[in-house]
């Protein structure tokens, strides 16, 4: 994925996370329980487009936030 696309996707994840009432710490903790080795700092970097997001992370975020892929990728 290109940098601009990942940045936009990160913005979408941040917005969805806030709407669903999760902090970055809470989201990273739920992702860790789901098997992803991720920190709050990594979530923050994903949200601002400074870290690549992997397919398994996208899938887990989708499940935790209970959203469609369309909402993440729009």
Q: For the regions a protein language model found, what residue spans apply to each?
A:
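DNA major-groove recognition helix of helix-turn-helix/homeodomain DNA-binding modules
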Residues: 50, 54-71
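Residue-level recognition of specific faces of alpha-helices
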Residues: 12, 42-45, 71
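Short alpha-helical DNA-recognition segment
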Residues: 21-45
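Residue-level signal for the short linker/turn that defines the boundary of a DNA-recognition helix
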Residues: 11, 21-22, 38, 53-56
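Residue-level detection of the helix-turn-helix DNA-binding "recognition helix"
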Residues: 18, 32-33, 48-50, 59
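A short, Lys/Arg-rich alpha-helix, primarily the initiator
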Residues: 1-20
